[in-house]
Amino acid sequence: DISSEDPSPCPVFEEDSMQVRADAIARRYEGERRLMEAVARGDMRAADMVEETTLRLERVPNKLRNRKNLFIVLNTLMRKAVEAAQVHPFYIDAISAKWAMRIEAVEQEADLYPMRREIVEDYCRLAQTRSMASYFPNVRSMLTYVQFNLAEGISLEAIARQLGVN
């Protein structure tokens, strides 16, 4: 029964609506990719890109929970960005855990907004100070070994043994 009060959806309009959604999703993913690349380079201007990417979605009705979820996603994206910059997981995990706890501790939505810039800048600084992307894998391994074993008596022989080189 076709009624003028409740017309059936027109397939063309459904496709248009789906296309609009698909385009918006593709733009969001592209924005996330650009943001992650900028953070991996340690580019502090990346903080200006955040609002364009992940923080505009409405996934759940509870506004605070929705924003916290989006900030957790942001934290995860930033973590993956600096991982791509060859930052050791030890350093990534420390910052990721710090932000996860701070995000969950927030009780008012407005308190989250200043964090977005802080989160991105924190990860940018991590990429600037701890990225080993410019080193060959064996040099990265050696540097990591030295960083994590400074309190031990480190010798050239111990490093060579650890890395399996002579």
Where are these regions (language model features)?
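Basic, amphipathic alpha-helical hairpins
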Residues: I103-V106, C124-S134, L143-I154
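Alpha-helix N-cap/N′ positions at the starts of helices
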Residues: R27-E30, P137, S141
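Short acidic alpha-helical/loop segments enriched in Asp/Glu that coordinate divalent cations
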Residues: P89-A94, S134, L156-E157
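Hydrophobic, helix-rich cores of sensory/ligand-binding and other regulatory modules
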Residues: D1-Y123
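Short, conserved alpha-helical segments within structured domains
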Residues: I95, Y135-N138, Q162
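Append "Primarily bacterial transcriptional regulators
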Residues: E157-N166
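The cytosolic transmitter module of two-component sensor histidine kinases
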Residues: R67, L112, Y135-V139, L156
